[in-house]
Structure formats: C-alpha cells, structure tokens
C-alpha cells in the first residue's frame, strides 16, 4: 500500500486548493474582536515599538507581516493597538533618545504605508466584486433570454451548478471580509435554494457520462465544441481541475487521469488559474499508480518534486515507487524472454469494466453506430395512413404511420401532439417534477437509481382537459383502452439525462411489480416526443440494433408482451444521454386487463 495513503475525502488529501499561508479570519468570529486582543495575542507594547523600529530600518519582520495580513476589522484594531503601543513606548522614556525617536518616525511612515496597502487591498477586493457582478450580469442576461436553450449545452448546465454551489459561496466569503449585511442577508436567504455538493457531483458525472458515451475527449468538452450547440461555453483550468478532483474523490481514477491531464494541457498553454501545477501532478501521479502504471507514476512524482522539493509525501512516494520498480525488475530478470506487458506506457488507459453487459452496444447505438437497419430490412418497412381500428375520428383524419422496425413491430406516428398541447402538458408537469424512480425488482418499491437520470411527474385527466384529450387520442391510435392504463407520465431529461437498458414489462421474478395496480403487466408502450434534441437522446434497442431519434410531435409505439402474455425480451430499450438539448417525453403504459378482446391471444405461444 502507498506509504502516504490518501483518503478520498478532501480533509485527508493534500489540499487540492491553493491555500494562503495566512487564511482569512472571519470578522464574525468573536476571537477576532477588539476585546479579545490581549497581551499574548498582540505582543507587549514595548515589543511592538521595537518591532516597528526594526521594520523602519528595513529588517525582516515576519511577525508584523502576519499581523497586517488579517481582514478589515481585526487589522484596523491591530494597527491602532500597535500605535498605542508605540505611544506607550514613547511614554516609557523614548524621548530621552533621539535615536529611538527617529525609529518611531520610520515606524509611523511604515504604518501609513501599510494602511495605504490595506486600502488598496480593499479597493482591489471591491474591483474584483464589481468585475464578478458585471460578468454575472452579462451571463444572466444571456441565460434568462432562453433558459432551456442555454441549458441545452451540458457545459452551461454544469457551470451553472458549479457557480451556485462553489463560486457564489466563495464570493460570499470574500464579501464577508467586509461589512455587507444587505448582500449577505439576501444571499443567505437564496442559498437555501442553491444546488448542493450532491448536485455539483451529479452535474460533473453527467459530463463524464457524455464523455464516455459519445467518445469525447476532455479537450473537446473544455472548448465546448459540441454538435448543435447554440451558445459558446468553455471550461477553465479550475473547472477542469474540479472535474478531476471530483472523479478522484469518487475513486474514479480513469476520469481523474483524463481531466488532470487536461488541466496540465491548459496550464502549459498559459491559461491563468488558482490551482498550482504541483497540485495537479499530486493527483495525477496517485491516479496513474492506482491504474497500475508505476513507471509513469514515478515520472510524474519526479516532476512534482522538481516543482516542490520540500513535498514530504511526494518524496516518500518516490522512494516507494522506486522500491516497487526495483522489485518488479528483480522478478522479471529470470524471465527476460517474456514479453513485457504493454501496460499503458503511452499514458492511455482502458475504461474500467462496467456492470452493464451490453454497455458497448448500447453506447454505440447512441452514437449511431451498429444500427442493423440493413437494406433487406428496410425493404420491409413502409409508410402509410393509419385509420385506427375503425375509430370514426381516424377515418376522417388518419395519422401518418411509419415503420421503425419490423420484428418486433415498432411504429412512429406523426403529428400526434400539437405545439400548444405540448406546452400545456409541460406547464402542468413542471411543478410536479421529481427525480424519476424505478421499481425495485425484489421489493416492488419505487426508488431512485443512478442508471435513470431524469425528472418525471404524473398527470391525471382531471388535471386539465388537454390530458384527457391526449389520452383519448392514444386510445384511438392503438385500439387499446386507457381505462386500465397508467397515468400519463411526463419526463424531462436534463444534462446527460438517460435511462439505461431496461424492460417496461415485469418479468417472472418481478410478479409483484404491478400487483398494487391490479391491472396485469404492461402490454404496450406509447412514447410521445415533446421536443427536438440537438444531439443525443435517442431511444435504442440493444438486442435489435435499432435506434430511434426524437422528433417533436411524433410518437413511437410497441408491444412489450407477445400475444401469449409472455414478455418480448427483444424490447429491452434505453434512453440515450442527452448530449445537447433538452428532452421532453410523455408516455402511456397500457396494461393487460381490459385488452382481452382488443388484443386477443394468438394461436401459438410466440404470436
């Protein structure tokens, strides 16, 4: 085990932020009030006079430099009390020595100088706050003009969460160094609605999910060079460092390496940052060690020590890495004919194995790769007018129907919902949106899961006439009754929103999944696309090699059960992560009960 082992939480890790040698004091802390400055805190008056005299003669004075680094209220108090100490020294027979008096002259001059430096520091702080306000004003003007369009770019979404969870609190700390009760009061009220650390973690993981699914390198994401993007958005060095640090804290060394390498790339390009290169190398060396690349871990540690020779832990790690390499060399000497493993010597590492067996197929389909829509299959797909099942409304105004897949039969209908209906459905759903859940196969209880990242709500017909209208339309199109169907579910996929491969129907070991409903299994799925998606967001069927892309106003329909009532395992499907855009869908799950005469059983088990 690495001698100087590092815990994943930031408290035991070597600080991942630039830490001032003199951290700012909180003016609200009673320890820094005037009343609590005693002799031990401030030095005695005579000692202060002597220190000031030394400083006036140009000598090094680290203790006074420490005192002048504190924040506004303590610093003014310190300066005043030091000056009182000087006066005390004068009263203590300083006038008897012109030499002492001249020292005081220099001391007073330096006091004025330090006071001006303090004022300049406060003005610089104010200028920094003004610059931030100007930047935020321009940014919010752009974002509020088209919130969904702005957030359609995943980098914008990530940076919004990061700003509210990290940057605004940092600004609060800066403002707290001065009197700003009005701003702090307002910020304190607003902060209860700010994203949390969990939100920032989720946003960062979403970017990494997009990175993996669509094979994007960190440089592409950092530059914001994504397809279909409406707004330019980039990641700074510190943003990239935040991504890498989060991956590190999650034990995800694969992404730690990718993002820390991006940090180094941008630092080498001359970008300004608060993070130091030594800190980046610290994370990177440990991450590549965890990935098994000992030679590179050694090389990175040497680079770290060249920048910070006093880094004790790095020195210990260096000796340990050298020891491990020597052990490996000794072990390979008797078998020199054996080919050395080409393990990541070029700094390229394999993505860790995943819990999802069809991960590669699923993600390939999301990218439009591996779609098995052969010319032979295409010949079996047709477009037609759908008149329903003798429904009078559809005889007068049939729907355009297009085959998306032949077996199992998956069809798309056009102009199913109007723009007005879509907006009304979204308006009804937004106040009710909550983290989408999945049904635990063992307990039947609904719970959140990392493989389903979206928010959803359920709408009843009594909520608005448009809900009843859409329900009736789906009934007319499918020829199935909605009386035993589930409520209309509306889902919104944000940045990196997805639903990994799953079945809509309950399998044999999940017999209690829909027991509470008392309507049997989910016989069919009707999925409405209520938005266009600039990039990503396809509905894919890994076992089929099918990919269906969202198109606003259209809907896709398929049966989950064979006519025998057995589940059709070919319908295992997924909602791909949204790369660019905002994906809105609504779906209706039809159940078995009530469909006996509308979709009767077939003559064989596989019908």
Where are the predicted features?
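Small-residue-rich alpha-helical packing segments, especially N-terminal targeting/signal peptides
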Residues: 3-4, 9-22
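Fe(II)/2-oxoglutarate oxygenase catalytic core
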Residues: 71-557, 561-607
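The N-terminal extracellular segments of secreted preproproteins, especially immediately downstream
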Residues: 21, 31-32, 43, 47, ...
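Generic short amphipathic/hydrophobic targeting helices enriched at N-termini
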Residues: 10, 14-15, 30, 66-68, ...
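Generic N-terminal simple sequence motifs
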Residues: 17-26, 39, 58, 70
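Polar low-complexity intrinsically disordered regions enriched in Ser/Thr and small residues
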Residues: 11, 31, 49-52, 59-62, ...
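Classical eukaryotic N-terminal signal peptides for Sec-dependent ER targeting/secretion
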Residues: 2-7, 41-83, 276
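Intrinsic-disorder-associated, low-complexity terminal segments enriched in Asp/Asn/His/Tyr and depleted
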Residues: 9, 22, 26-29, 35-38, ...
């Amino acid at each position: 085990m690495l001698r100087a082992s590092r815990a994943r939480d930031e408290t035991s890790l070597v600080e991942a932020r630039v830490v001032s040698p003199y951290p700012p004091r909180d003016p609200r802390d009673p320890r820094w009030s005037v009343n609590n400055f005693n002799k031990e805190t401030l030095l005695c008056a005579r000692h202060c006079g002597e220190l000031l005299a030394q400083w006036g003669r140009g000598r090094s004075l680290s203790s006074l430099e420490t005192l002048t680094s504190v924040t506004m209220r303590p610093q003014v108090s310190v300066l005043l009390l030091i000056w009182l100490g000087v006066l005390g020294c004068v009263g203590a027979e300083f006038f008897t020595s012109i030499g002492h008096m001249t020292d005081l002259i220099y001391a007073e001059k330096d006091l004025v100088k330090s006071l001006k430096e303090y004022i300049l520091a406060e003005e610089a702080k104010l200028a920094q706050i003004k610059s931030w306000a100007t930047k935020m004003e321009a940014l919010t003007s752009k974002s509020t003009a088209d919130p969904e369009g702005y957030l359609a770019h995943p980098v914008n979404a990530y940076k919004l969460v990061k700003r509210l969870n990290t940057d605004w609190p940092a600004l609060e700390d800066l403002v707290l160094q001065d009197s700003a009760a009005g701003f702090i009061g307002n910020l304190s009220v607003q902060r209860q609605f700010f994203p949390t650390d969990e939100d920032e973690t989720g946003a960062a993981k979403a970017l990494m999910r997009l990175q993996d699914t669509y094979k994007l390198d960190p440089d592409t994401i950092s530059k914001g060079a994504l397809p279909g993007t409406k707004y330019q958005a980039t990641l700074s060095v510190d943003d990239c460092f935040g991504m890498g640090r989060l991956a590190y804290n999650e034990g995800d060394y694969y992404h730690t390496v990718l993002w820390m390498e991006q940090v180094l790339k941008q630092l080498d390009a001359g970008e300004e940052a608060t993070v130091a290169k030594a800190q980046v190398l610290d994370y990177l060396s440990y991450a590549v060690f965890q990935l098994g690349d000992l030679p590179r871990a050694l090389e990175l540690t040497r680079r770290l020590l060249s920048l910070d020779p006093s880094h004790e832990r790095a020195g210990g790690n260096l000796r340990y890495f050298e020891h491990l390499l020597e052990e490996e060399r000794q072990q390979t000497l008797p078998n020199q004919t054996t080919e050395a493993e080409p393990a990541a010597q070029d700094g390229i590492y394999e993505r860790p194995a995943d819990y999802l067996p069809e991960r590669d197929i699923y993600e390939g389909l999301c990218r439009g790769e591996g779609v098995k829509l052969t010319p032979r299959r295409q010949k079996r797909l047709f477009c037609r007018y759908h008149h329903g099942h003798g429904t009078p409304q559809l005889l007068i105004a049939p729907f355009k129907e297009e085959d998306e897949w032949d077996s199992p039969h998956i069809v798309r209908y056009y102009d199913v919902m109007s723009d007005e209906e879509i907006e009304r459905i979204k308006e009804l759903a937004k106040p009710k949106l909550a983290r989408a859940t999945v049904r635990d196969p063992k307990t039947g209880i609904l719970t959140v899961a990392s493989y389903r990242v979206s928010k959803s709500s359920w709408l009843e017909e009594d909520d608005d006439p448009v809900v009843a209208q859409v329900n009736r339309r789906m009934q007319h199109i499918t020829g199935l009754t909605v009386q035993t169907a589930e409520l209309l579910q509306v889902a919104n996929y944000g940045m990196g929103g997805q639903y990994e491969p799953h079945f809509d129907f309950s399998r044999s070991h999940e017999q209690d999944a829909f027991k509470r409903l008392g309507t049997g299994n989910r016989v069919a799925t009707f999925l409405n696309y209520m938005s266009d998606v600039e990039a990503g967001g396809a509905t894919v069927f890994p076992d089929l090699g099918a990919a269906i892309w969202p198109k606003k106003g259209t809907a896709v329909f398929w049966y989950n059960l064979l006519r025998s009532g057995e589940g059709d395992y070919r319908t295992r499907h997924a909602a791909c992560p949204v790369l660019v855009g905002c994906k809105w869908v609504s779906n209706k799950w039809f159940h078995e009960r009530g469909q006996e005469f509308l979709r009767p059983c077939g003559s064989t088990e596989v019908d």
